[in-house]
Amino acid sequence: MNMAEIAQLGVSNPYKQQYENYIGGAWVPPAGGEYFESTTPITGKPFTRVPRSGQQDVDAALDAAHAAKAAWARTSTTERANILNRIADRIEANLKLLAVAESIDNGKPVRETTAADLPLAVDHFRYFAGCIRAQEGGISEIDADTIAYHFHEPLGVVGQIIPWNFPLLMATWKLAPALAAGNCVVLKPAEQTPASILVLMEVIGDLLPPGVVNVINGFGLEAGKPLASSPRISKVAFTGETTTGRLIMQYASQNLIPVTLELGGKSPNIFFEDVLAADDAFFDKALEGFAMFALNQGEVCTCPSRALIQESIYDRFMERALKRVAAIRQGHPLDTGTMIGAQASAEQLEKILSYIDLGRKEGAQCLTGGERNVLDGDLAGGYYVKPTVFAGHNKMRIFQEEIFGPVVSVTTFKDEEEALAIANDTLYGLGAGVWTRDGARAFRMGRGIQAGRVWTNCYHAYPAHAAFGGYKQSGIGRENHRMMLDHYQQTKNLLVSYSPNALGFF
């Protein structure tokens, strides 16, 4: 990376030349002595080296977690909450450094990491600090002499496998509730974006007892599979594509442990004709909602990658929507004016370009974009794709398969019934958007769409206290909200008799 570009943001280079695994509160070289280069999508060039871990490293991390789990589970909820709040404070104090680290690792614009990813991470830690302080058990009076007590107890040691699209935020989504609930964690980041979590551990590691959080890097089959299939974890949480999620579920089933899976999506974004009833702030907001397919370079599981426009307004709406897309500024991710950055990897770049080619072969009309964006200078080797809009129909593969890039496929509908049918004609059910000035219609559509989250007159908001998760092949379980504590705890029932008298059966 160009150090001058980083310095302009008021921070030094967040990365060292080489990292180790973070195990038991210390930096530990991989047992096999192997490393791999991590490449920044900004230029397509390596910027650091991280461990290529294997079974021995997974075992070492599990050893450290098990050594810490009893003491951490006994730590009072007050102290755990205080630690989570201190983590939030430390992240906030180093927000710019971590935002730059995330942009270098993932390729997303620094304006997003600064304004969204890292502030959300801060808020999630604070939210779960509050949740665990407020959590209560239960008492049931069976009769005058018999009481049932219900306690929330941690699962113990949990495995977490993090995706490459939001490396720090998705790690936070899993770490915050797991730690609040009293669990120890072994976490494996995606091999495409392995480095920003290591910078985070440099920043917050001293706030946690050794072994409570352990980070091992490596590839899926070499490190992820041994972790997910280990009989020494009590749960596995995974965010990623649906095909890998099936494998994670199979691994977990061998040990009969619970899973949380947040998987793929093909989210509909539905615009009813009344959005054009006036050319006002609401319509402007709806146009932004259409353009949200390009947020994070389209690398979002809930990317609104299917746009459904009521046919009575299609031409007028699309004229304005395409102008909005054309105004999206693509450029250097460390430029604070950049609105869309680079795809996370060369592999993902090629996948997106192959789907763009497929769309044309299927007969879809490319309305804008539709190609790689080759930028100047050092950025020429980066992984950039122009925001792309296709027009077609819902049976096309570009409407049915997850592309995970800045590509939206647009079609029309006649009425509410057809809109709902098209929206639900998918294997997935993670997110959806509904845009209308009619509150009753918004409610009907929200209840009728088969998705875990339906944004209504908004899109891509991810507050800590709103449950997130999928229907159908988009996953199992929920993330965020206080209900997430239930995913990382088990219930202990003490059924106590205070009567001195025998039951009288024997």
Swiss-Prot record:
| Residues the entry annotates as binding NAD(+) | G240, E241, T242, T243, T244, G245
The protein's annotated pathway: Alcohol metabolism; ethanol degradation; acetate from ethanol: step 2/2; Ketone degradation; acetoin degradation
Keyword NAD tagged? yes
* Root EC class: oxidoreductase
Q: Which UniProt keywords apply?
A: Acetoin catabolism, NAD, Oxidoreductase
Entry's PROSITE patterns? ALDEHYDE_DEHYDR_CYS (PS00070), ALDEHYDE_DEHYDR_GLU (PS00687)
The record's section on Gene3D superfamilies has:
Aldehyde Dehydrogenase, Chain A, domain 1 (3.40.605.10), Aldehyde Dehydrogenase, Chain A, domain 2 (3.40.309.10)
> What molecular function does GO assign, one term?
aldehyde dehydrogenase (NAD+) activity
Q: Which GO terms describe its biological process?
A: acetoin catabolic process; ethanol catabolic process
The family assignment reads: Belongs to the aldehyde dehydrogenase family.
Protein name (Swiss-Prot/TrEMBL) = Acetaldehyde dehydrogenase 2
